[in-house]
């Protein structure tokens, strides 16, 4: 089992159990690069310099600064920042249970796996998990994680639980603002029926293994080609999408395209 990044308690009312939090997503397997000197091949290091004098600034003289006006900063010392970190009792205290579908995906931040920490926690952990599963509910809990008070949505996931940290309301931009210039159009009749038919023929199941990271694969191929002293394979230019001049004709052609494979199979 991967190392836990946080350990504490999961509590609902007077029922509690020791739990461990594990990262559910990681970018460590992606191709990554260092910055090197083209002439020597040596790695280069980053150095902080004064923006005005151009002189290097020693680490002990570097402090955080909040900009209150152009190039005017209020300096904040590390111990002053540390004093603002909320006190933690290491407890994911459940405040409420809500239907899983009620939390808008725009509020999801990062996913974590939640597991029982030790044999003594197994029974209470299973009780909380199965209770939520039976009610098709998710728990909303709050605790201090990574120096911030976070709201976390917890729900059953296989033999364990999955916990999503949630974005604060002020961090999520209003959809009304993003969609403000979209006119209200009512689609009906044959056009809507054709669209529904196309969607029906494309129905499937979510399989994350079917979605490959083409950029990372291309980077890996580039590195391999460099090591082998050959030119990397040239990628084919993607087919450009364009708006159809006749939407109804495009819908009918799409329906016909889905029907052709069926006819070949039937024949």
UniProtKB/Swiss-Prot annotation:
With LigD forms a non-homologous end joining (NHEJ) DNA repair enzyme, which repairs dsDNA breaks with reduced fidelity. Binds linear dsDNA with 5'- and 3'- overhangs but not closed circular dsDNA nor ssDNA. Recruits and stimulates the ligase activity of LigD. One of its GO terms (biological process) is DNA recombination. GO terms for molecular function: double-stranded DNA binding. It comes from the Bacteria. The lineage of its organism: Bacteria, Pseudomonadati, Pseudomonadota, Alphaproteobacteria, Rhodobacterales. This is Non-homologous end joining protein Ku. Residues 11-195 form the Ku domain. The keyword DNA repair applies. The keyword DNA repair applies. SMART domains: Ku78. Keywords: DNA damage, DNA recombination, DNA repair, DNA-binding. Homodimer. Interacts with LigD. InterPro entries: Ku70/Ku80_beta-barrel_dom, Prok_Ku, SPOC-like_C_dom_sf. It comes from Cereibacter sphaeroides (strain KD131 / KCTC 12085) (Rhodobacter sphaeroides). Pfam families: Ku. Gene3D superfamilies: 2.40.290.10. Residues 229-267 are annotated as: Disordered.
